[in-house]
Amino acid sequence: MKKWLIALAGVLLTFTLAGCGSKTVASTSGGKITESQYYSSMKGTSSGKQVLQQMILNKVLEKDYGSKVSTKQVTKQYNTYKSQYGSSFSTVLSQNGLTTKTFKEQLRSNLLLKEAVKDKVKITDKALKKQWKSYEPKVTVQHILVAKSATADKVLDALKKDSSQANFTKLAKKYSTDTTTKNDGGKLSAFDNTNTSYSSKFLTAAFKLKNGEYTTSAVKTSNGYEIIRMIKNPGKGKMSDHTADLKKQIWDNDMSDSTVLQNVVSKVLKGGNVSIKDNDLKDILSSYLSTSSSSSSN
């Protein structure tokens, strides 16, 4: 898989050349470097070619799917990441060589690519049924995290006497070591089966609970011992009621599948009327323009 595809779905590289010519981009005691010299040097490198590939794909994606991706969507994703990293957000951007502007460009490119995936990949009934097996709707729980099993046993003994939400909240404030949630009674943001923040043990235990139920034994995770109480579990219901969610999960999985992405990008570029004017770069997209294959999630 070409690195540029991975970069597009991960860290977007930005690169601009303003009419390559005699304009000086740098000067030294040994002479000056012109735009044309810089261009000639860059186009022979793998990174230079990757950037051009990205620029071409972005142009075609923007034309085909630009109207489907709004500034509001980009801003929403940006704010989600900003909230996730909190005060360290600016540092994280800087460490990855990104600014607010370039990060938003990255997010927009990912959203455009996802629209292409949704357009080019056919989701079969078989794929929906397969995704349904692991599907769980969004649930809301509260938890109590402690470091020692003895403490967990003490909490469980208290819950045997009173398993109400009010008492669980009281116990979370008293015993939980999760400083982020304890003051809110250990309440966590809603999550479904695609969540990667919690361990598989935690998720498995949580999804088994009905409203008002709690884990009668502590769940051992890498964080410690956790007691989970279900606040809201709508139940899995029928597959036909969750088709939209299932498709979304499949498309999200496709965004991490290099084979699917390569097929999608190939189709996008073939329909983009791409013409490479520089003979030295004429084969830059050959691996994508010379083959054809069907894309489907099955």
UniProtKB/Swiss-Prot annotation:
Gene Ontology annotations of biological process type: protein folding
GO molecular function, one term: peptidyl-prolyl cis-trans isomerase activity
Protein topology in the membrane: Lipid-anchor
Entry's localization field: Cell membrane
Lipidated positions per record (S-diacylglycerol cysteine): C20
Cellular component terms per the entry's GO annotation: plasma membrane
Keywords attached to this entry: Cell membrane, Isomerase, Lipoprotein, Membrane, Palmitate, Rotamase, Signal
EC number, as in UniProt: 5.2.1.8
Pfam families xref list: Rotamase (PF00639)
Disulfide pairings: none
SUPFAM superfamilies the record matches: FKBP-like (SSF54534), Triger factor/SurA peptide-binding domain-like (SSF109998)
UniProt catalytic activity: [protein]-peptidylproline (omega=180) = [protein]-peptidylproline (omega=0)
Signal peptide bounds: 1-19
Lipidation (N-palmitoyl cysteine): C20
Record-stated family: Belongs to the PrsA family.
Annotated protein name in UniProt: Foldase protein PrsA 1
Organism of origin: Lactiplantibacillus plantarum (strain ATCC BAA-793 / NCIMB 8826 / WCFS1)
